[in-house]
Every structure is written in structure tokens, then in C-alpha cells.
């Protein structure tokens, strides 16, 4: 990498974009500093000196949010950054996906890309700056990389598309799209939307790509100026004689029949048996190099299985389980599966099954997001779990990984648009989707199961949502789009394009590919075919439950709202929280108070809510001049008696207003605890209440 500092500038969405090389992190294979507005990101790329065994490309992309970038000190006892937030993990995945397909085939060197956010401007996306930084760090390094790539955010406001919308613009945008690609094509899409049509989504993607092309050209100019020397990489060529021999043996032993097996587990058994039988032809225990040969044979076998699956789809239009290219697997759905859960839905599509379980909570149970931007409160959460048993395997039980976090977030994006507004449904909503069985498209099954759970729980959703995953097999100049891909088609195909939405439009999409990029024609066809599949799935789901239940579960908390004057909030809370804690202890409810005076009262017991509401009403009631009250004498002084009008509010009845006749001592007429009827005669500027019994005589 060049050791001389160089600075390159351009404009990006009406803000300055600067890329600096040659000054920082000079021991990395490649490093750049990206300045976008006031956002600053350091991106580095490092490759190992030796390749790794195996067939998987070991790429690791990291995205680190340093709290000092936003002028914050981390919370917690240690006061330092801990494990990456879910949002940082999702950004790392977002950067990984468009970069991964652009490394040479067969490249097995470890590559680690580190993106460190040093300064964060909320209106200048650190995520997109990091994507450009990652591309540039690879491009100016000696690591083989077929870039550059770039990514942009696209909003949709009042019928107009906007590149990299500001925070204020995002609030009114119907679309939150992230799209990436290179000069010739799009190769990554991620979006959440408010029922955007397929045509609107397609235009948004390629509106973004036009800006991507400009950014890629800018990066290419930098590369041409620096002229980095790339390390030579020559993939290991397989022995053609050996390939032909293995190919002949697989055909003789029924490769096509082994692939064309409806049941996933039986197909795996058949293929394993075939591979074992073919490999046995090459076993020679006396040959010291035999182990290396068997590894090569197994690698060839895997390639042949992949080629046969792709050939059958492309040429014969036959899928491994016998379906047509646009056919959905058999569907089953059920609601009310768990008696004590607030809502539950079981969705099965072929050999993929998801159980989604919903819990309702009070507003105090929302999630607090304290990242580089303003602190946010999230009242809808969707979590996704993928246990080993779902694919018939054993293994350690760990906390959620990148994949689980990503699939959970995709489901959350797909469903968040249909969650009712706070004013209509004052609850925190959490859904957990447990994948019980998986043969592809489990994230989309979790979306369908979650919709069923929402309706079962009685959540008044705006519309049901279903999700479907589309696949692609390219061959020479032709291509075949697949509806509802299974695991083998995902692993051996060219695309995993997830589309979720209502009958009216798209609420979320996610596209990953293994080829260089997709044309507008392919994306349009995939979106249109996905719509047909989505509508068919929605029809099936509505046969199970066609509308949200009219009542919440008996085990769910009931939440009611009431509004008080903001200046009365302190009366409800009391000194040091004394009064609000008394209400909670006495009634067992949960209380959440907003600054505008909105109070959320939550409890399973409706009577408890009524008691708490009554107490708060008494605390916040205001005396009215001319109103007659019957209250208890609380205190007696020489000059008069204090009578409780209602809890928290006393009135002074002067000694001259206690009786018609003149009295010398208040105690001659009243004692503490007496019930006394009085009429409010005055409320002074300080809120003190004066009353009279005499006025009623």
C-alpha cells in the first residue's frame, strides 16, 4: 500500500465525500479514511499469508461503533464498548454481502475487513461510508478483488426518490432501502417499506444504482491513480482425467435419481451413499497420498452434485423435490398452539416449520436503543432462533449469531409497518420465532408464523403479511427463477431473494447473490413472481384465521391510557417516587407516564386497573369554585379546619365559615375524622382552596 498521504474528493447527496489513503494503518494490506460530511470511518483490509483448508471463503467483515464518535460515554460498570450491538452486526452483514461475490473463485485466504466509526453525523450514514471504505480498502490493497462496489440508501417521499435521506426525511419516507452493486449491476438489496408496489421498488433500486455507478467511477479513478500491485492468484485446477472418471462413476450410480428425491433427509442419505460408493473406488490404504486424493474426489463429487441440480433446473425445469419452478411447497398453519401464551402461530411450508410466540407487555418493557444516534425506544421486537435440531444436527448451544440476528431483524422490518400505532394499541409487543424444522426459507416462515401469532393475540394489525424466498439458476445466457426455494436450491443456486408484504405491497426485501450482479429484467421478474407466491400464501393463512381476535388473551396484560395535565405529573409521582410506588404496591399495576401527561396503566386484572385509575383521578382532580364536597376533617388549627375534598387536595374552612353563629373554638363544633359538607368559595393564585359550611346553611 502507498505510504504517501493522498486525498480524493467528490460530492455525494449534496454533502462532501473525501477518501484519504497512505497516512493511517499502514501495516494493513489496505486502509482508507472516509469522510462523509462529519462522519469519519477508518476501513482496513488484511489477508492471511496462507490459504485455509475447506471449500468456504473465510471472509470476516466487522463494523465497530465507538461511542466517542457521537460524544457519548458507554454505559455499564466498565464504561467501555462491549460486544457489537445488533445494529452493528446487521451493518457488518450488509457490507459483507455485496463484497463476497467479487473475490476470485477458489480464493481461500482469510480476509478481515475492519470498519471503525470515529465520528458520526446522523445525517451522513456511517453504514454507507463504511461500505465505500471497505470497497476502497480492498481496491487499494494487494488483495485480489473484482471491485470496486458502492452502496446507497434510498428514500421515497411524496412520490420522489431521495439518495441518503436525512433523519428528518426518514421519518416521512415510505421506503428505507439499502442497495449496493458495481458498475454493471446490482448485487445486494435490503429494504423495509410501507406497502411499496413492485414497480416502485424496482425503480427505487435502479435509481440507487445510477448513483452507485457514479461512486464506483470515483473509486476507480482513485485506483487508477494509486495503481496498487495485486498478488497473483491462480486457482487450483482439478485433474480433468480424475474429474471425468468421477463423473462417469456418479452417472453409473444414479446421480440424477439421488438428487430427485422429495424428502430432504432421504436425499441426503442417497447422496451420501453415492459419494461413499464412488470414493471407495479410489481408496488405496497402502498409498500415502490417498487421503489427499479422496479429498479431491469428494470436492469433485460436490461440484458434480451442484452441476446436476443446476442442469436439471435449467434444462429440464425439474427441481430436486419434483416441483415446478413457480410452485410452492405444501402449506399448513395453526393458531392458538400454546394455551398460556398471549398469541401463537405455527406455520409449515414443506419441511420448514416455524413456531412464533407473541408476548404483550406494558410500555415500560420497550427496548432502549442507545447507539451513535439519539436514544430510541422500540416497542416491537421480533427474535429468531435456529436450534441445531431443526436440521437434525448436534452442536453447542450459543447466544444468537449473525445469521439469527439478521433473520430476526428482517422479520421485524417486514412486520413493523402493520403494528398499530401507540395511541391505538398501547403495548410493547415481542415475538419469538422458533425454527423447529428447516429446509430453506425459514426466515420467511417466521414472518408468516408471526402474522398468525399477531392475529391470534388480538393485535389489530393493519393487514396480514406473508414472506417468500425466490431463487435463481443461470446457465450460459439463460436463467430460471424459482419460487419458494428449499435448502439445496439456496446452497447451490445463484440467488436468495426474500420478499415479504401484504396483499397491497412490499414491506421488506433482502437479496443476496453469488454471481456478479443482476439485471433489471431478472429483478423485475423475481419481484412479480414473488407477488404471485405471496398472495397464494396469504390466501392460505386467511383460511386459518381471517382477522385478529376481538379480545386479548385472558393471560395478557390489559393496558388503558388516561391523560392528565403535565403539571400534575409530579403529584402522581410524589416526592422521590413515593406516591407512584404507593399506587403500584396497592394495586399491583404497572404505570408508565409520558411527559405530555399520558399515563399507561397495565395489569392482567381489570379491577386493579380501575382502582389505580380512580386513585390517579383523585390525585389529579381539581377543585371547582361553587362545587359542594363532602370530606373528612384532616386537621384542626386555631383559625379553622382543613377538610379533605379528595385524596391529595384539602380545603381550609375558616372558623368564621363553620357555623352561622360565632364560635370561639373550632373544637367546639368539629373534631378530626368528622365528615363535613362544604362549598368551595375561592381558589387563590397558589392553588390554595378556601371553603365554607356556613354558605350551605
Swiss-Prot record:
Q: Where is the S1 motif domain?
A: 626-694
Bilayer-spanning residue ranges: none
Q: What is this protein called?
A: Polyribonucleotide nucleotidyltransferase
- Using the UniProt record, give the first listed, main subcellular location: cytoplasm
| Entry EC no(s) | 2.7.7.8
Reactions catalysed, semicolon-separated, are: RNA(n+1) + phosphate = RNA(n) + a ribonucleoside 5'-diphosphate
Function in brief: Involved in mRNA degradation. Catalyzes the phosphorolysis of single-stranded polyribonucleotides processively in the 3'- to 5'-direction.
Keyword Cytoplasm part of the UniProt annotation: yes
Cofactor dependency: Mg(2+)
Pfam families to which the protein is assigned, alphabetical: KH_1, PNPase, RNase_PH, RNase_PH_C, S1
Source domain of life: Bacteria
Q: Which organism is it from?
A: Staphylococcus saprophyticus subsp. saprophyticus (strain ATCC 15305 / DSM 20229 / NCIMB 8711 / NCTC 7292 / S-41)
**Which stretches are annotated as coiled coil?**
none
- Molecular function terms in GO for this entry? 3'-5'-RNA exonuclease activity; magnesium ion binding; polyribonucleotide nucleotidyltransferase activity; RNA binding
Domain KH, residue spans: 557-616
Question: Where is this chain's protein located in or outside the cell?
Answer: Cytoplasm
Amino acid at each position: 500500500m502507498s505510504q504517501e498521504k493522498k486525498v480524493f474528493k467528490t460530492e455525494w447527496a449534496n454533502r462532501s465525500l473525501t477518501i484519504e489513503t497512505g497516512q493511517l494503518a499502514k501495516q494493513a494490506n489496505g486502509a482508507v479514511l472516509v469522510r462523509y460530511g462529519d462522519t469519519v470511518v477508518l476501513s482496513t483490509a488484511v489477508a492471511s499469508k496462507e490459504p485455509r483448508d475447506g471449500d468456504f471463503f473465510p471472509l470476516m467483515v466487522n463494523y465497530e461503533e465507538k461511542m466517542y464518535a457521537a460524544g457519548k460515554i458507554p454505559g455499564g460498570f466498565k464504561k467501555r464498548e462491549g460486544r457489537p450491538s445488533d445494529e452493528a452486526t446487521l451493518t457488518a452483514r450488509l457490507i459483507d454481502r455485496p463484497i463476497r461475490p467479487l473475490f476470485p473463485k477458489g480464493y481461500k485466504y482469510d480476509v478481515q475487513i475492519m470498519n471503525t466509526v470515529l465520528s458520526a453525523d446522523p445525517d451522513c450514514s456511517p453504514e454507507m461510508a463504511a461500505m465505500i471504505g471497505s470497497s476502497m480498502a480492498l481496491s487499494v490493497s494487494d488483495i485480489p478483488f473484482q471491485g470496486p462496489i458502492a452502496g446507497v440508501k434510498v428514500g421515497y417521499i411524496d412520490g420522489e426518490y431521495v439518495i441518503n435521506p436525512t433523519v428528518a426525511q426518514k421519518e416521512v419516507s415510505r421506503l428505507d432501502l439499502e442497495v449496493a452493486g458495481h458498475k454493471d449491476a446490482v448485487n445486494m438489496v435490503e429494504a423495509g417499506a410501507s406497502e411499496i408496489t413492485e414497480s416502485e421498488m424496482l425503480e427505487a433500486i435502479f435509481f440507487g444504482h445510477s448513483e452507485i455507478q457514479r461512486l464506483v467511477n470515483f473509486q476507480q479513478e482513485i485506483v487508477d491513480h494509486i495503481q496498487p500491485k495485486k498478488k497473483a492468484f491462480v486457482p487450483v485446477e482439478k485433474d480433468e482425467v480424475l474429474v471425468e472418471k468421477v463423473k462417469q462413476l456418479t452417472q453409473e450410480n444414479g446421480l440424477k435419481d439421488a438428487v430427485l428425491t422429495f424428502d430432504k433427509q432421504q436425499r441426503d442419505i442417497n447422496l451420501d451413499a453415492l459419494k461413499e460408493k464412488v470414493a471407495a473406488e479410489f481408496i488405496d490404504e497402502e498409498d500415502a497420498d490417498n487421503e489427499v486424493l479422496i479429498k479431491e474426489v469428494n470436492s469433485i463429487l460436490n461440484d458434480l452434485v451442484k452441476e446436476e441440480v443446476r442442469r436439471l433446473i435449467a434444462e429440464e425445469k425439474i427441481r430436486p423435490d419434483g416441483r415446478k419452478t413457480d410452485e410452492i411447497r405444501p402449506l399448513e398453519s395453526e393458531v392458538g398452539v400454546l394455551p398460556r401464551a398471549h398469541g401463537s402461530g405455527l406455520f409449515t411450508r414443506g419441511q420448514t416449520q416455524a413456531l412464533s410466540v407473541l408476548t404483550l407487555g406494558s410500555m415500560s418493557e420497550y427496548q432502549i436503543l442507545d447507539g451513535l444516534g439519539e436514544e430510541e425506544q422500540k416497542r416491537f421486537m421480533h427474535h429468531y432462533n435456529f436450534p441445531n435440531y431443526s436440521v437434525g444436527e448436534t452442536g453447542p448451544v450459543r447466544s444468537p449469531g449473525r445469521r439469527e440476528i439478521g433473520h430476526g431483524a428482517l422479520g421485524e422490518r417486514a412486520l413493523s409497518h402493520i403494528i398499530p400505532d401507540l395511541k391505538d394499541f398501547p403495548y410493547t409487543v415481542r415475538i419469538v420465532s422458533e425454527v423447529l424444522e428447516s429446509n430453506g426459507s425459514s426466515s420467511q416462515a417466521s414472518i408468516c408464523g408471526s402474522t398468525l401469532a399477531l392475529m391470534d393475540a388480538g393485535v389489530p394489525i393493519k393487514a396480514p403479511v406473508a414472506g417468500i424466498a425466490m431463487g435463481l439458476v443461470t446457465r450460459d445466457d439463460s436463467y430460471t427463477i424459482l419460487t419458494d426455494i428449499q435448502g439445496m436450491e439456496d446452497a447451490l443456486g445463484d440467488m436468495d431473494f426474500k420478499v415479504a408484504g401484504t396483499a397491497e405491497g412490499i414491506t421488506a426485501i433482502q437479496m443476496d447473490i453469488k454471481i456478479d450482479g443482476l439485471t433489471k429484467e431478472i429483478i423485475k421478474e423475481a419481484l412479480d413472481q414473488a407477488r404471485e407466491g405471496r398472495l397464494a400464501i396469504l390466501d392460505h393463512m386467511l383460511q386459518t384465521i381471517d382477522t385478529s381476535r376481538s379480545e386479548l388473551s385472558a393471560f395478557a396484560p390489559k393496558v388503558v391510557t388516561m391523560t392528565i395535565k403535565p403539571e400534575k405529573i409530579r403529584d402522581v409521582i410524589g416526592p422521590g417516587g413515593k406516591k407512584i410506588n404507593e399506587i403500584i404496591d396497592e394495586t399491583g399495576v404497572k404505570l408508565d407516564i409520558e411527559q405530555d401527561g399520558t399515563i399507561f396503566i397495565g395489569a392482567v386484572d381489570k379491577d386493579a386497573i380501575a382502582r389505580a385509575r380512580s386513585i390517579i383521578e383523585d390525585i389529579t382532580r381539581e377543585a371547582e369554585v361553587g362545587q359542594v364536597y363532602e370530606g373528612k376533617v384532616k386537621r384542626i388549627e386555631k383559625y379553622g379546619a382543613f377538610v379533605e375534598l379528595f385524596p391529595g387536595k384539602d380545603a381550609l374552612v375558616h372558623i368564621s365559615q363553620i357555623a352561622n353563629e360565632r364560635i370561639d373554638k373550632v373544637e367546639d363544633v368539629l373534631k378530626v375524622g368528622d365528615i363535613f359538607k362544604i362549598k368551595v368559595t375561592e381558589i387563590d393564585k397558589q392553588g390554595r382552596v378556601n371553603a365554607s359550611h356556613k354558605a350551605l346553611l
